[in-house]
A protein has these predicted regions:
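C-terminal "post-core" interaction segments
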Residues: 1-253
């Protein structure tokens, strides 16, 4: 469970991975849910842990050619073959999306959860008089396959663009999701104490799906079929509720 991409993130992740390897790690779940992002270098270094040499991680593109920049791996990864699932949700942004998008496009990991936030732009601050400044977006980040990560929040006609879409979509009640992460955060944010997993009293359907997939008890096709059926059932229930409400209002008039 990675809470952000700060200056110490990669060091901590490396330490955890080495310990897991000693314990005989056979597969890995990288949890980036509610991770708001952070340093670009952290995202690039994270991807390098799992990807092959000379693979594209992310690139930037703007109106000027000068704003085009590629970020690639430059060495063999220490964990290139361990089966992986990356967990994301609407709270996963920026560096989280760069990592999940890179691993997904390079077919290095399966992504599970909900569509990510959609925030990945390169900004430049132009100084103004009086100590003020103007923050200007000069470029945007794209996944290796050319997908724009930044979501367009103004143009509703482009609502399907931006963010990282999971391979395995799992709908979760927002309140339930917060309860799950309150338990996880007891481990992460308890200074001075040895990290121990608390008794998990709350169900985590996204993690459950990831484990089923990694243990071979659920195929990607089965997971996608279940997600489509759940979505259709939800839409049908929504339509039925709307029709019932309309009928009730009609009787009252």
């Amino acid at each position: 469970y990675v809470v952000d991409f700060s200056g110490h993130t990669i060091e901590a992740v490396n330490k955890a991975l080495k310990e897991l390897k000693k314990q005989g790690m056979k597969s890995l779940v990288l949890d980036l849910r509610f991770n708001p992002g952070g340093l670009l270098t952290g995202a690039v270094d994270m991807a390098k842990l799992f990807m092959g040499d000379k693979q594209m991680i992310v690139y930037t593109k703007g109106r000027k050619k000068d704003f085009y920049q590629e970020f690639k791996t430059n060495a063999k990864a220490p964990y290139p073959d361990v089966p992986m699932v990356v967990l994301v949700n609407q709270g996963s942004a920026s560096a989280s999306e760069i990592v999940s998008g890179a691993l997904q496009d390079n077919k290095r990991a399966v992504v599970a959860g909900q569509r990510s936030f959609g925030k990945a732009s390169v900004q430049q601050v132009l100084p103004l008089s009086g100590g003020a400044g103007l923050r200007l977006t000069i470029a945007k980040y794209y996944t290796p396959a050319g997908r724009l990560i930044q979501r367009n929040y103004r143009d509703k006609s482009k609502a399907d663009e931006g963010g990282i879409f999971p391979d395995i979509e799992v709908e979760v009640d927002p309140e339930q999701e917060i309860k799950v992460f309150m338990q996880y955060n007891k481990v992460v944010y308890t200074p001075g104490k040895k990290a121990q997993l608390p008794e998990m009293t709350e169900k985590d359907p996204v993690l459950d799906k990831a484990v089923l997939y990694l243990t071979g008890k659920l195929t990607l096709e089965q997971a996608q079929k279940e997600a489509a059926e759940a979505k259709a059932a939800k839409e049908a229930a929504k339509t039925k509720k709307a029709a019932s409400k309309k009928e009730t209002q009609g009787k009252k008039t």
